[in-house]
């Protein structure tokens, strides 16, 4: 599954490789992996630019699902960390605003509570290798679909 990819503007979304044995769970996993392949493209570009991605901290709704977090760790070949307070930007902005208003005396202490680790996901080398091979096949498919549309 893919869509919204800048390199292939004509490709909107496809499910490929499905059989009659695949169920709704397989389709949901396709959705997650499709997003993950787009993440792979982005993180590959970051790494080529010299940005260190040995650990990613995931926040908001996407941090609440264990399977999704493990898929991200495997696909991106990086340690993924989730936080006990998954809210991300909104609660952090509220803390900064409360500090600015004088309601919180110690900004650093308040923010550190936001950074307590909930879970850590380590990439599985076998899964990472499988995703990398599939990613290369995906590139071939995207080029073909982009040219056909």
What annotation goes with each model-predicted range?
Residues 1-149:
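Glycine/Thr-rich phosphate-binding loops that ligate phosphate moieties of nucleotide
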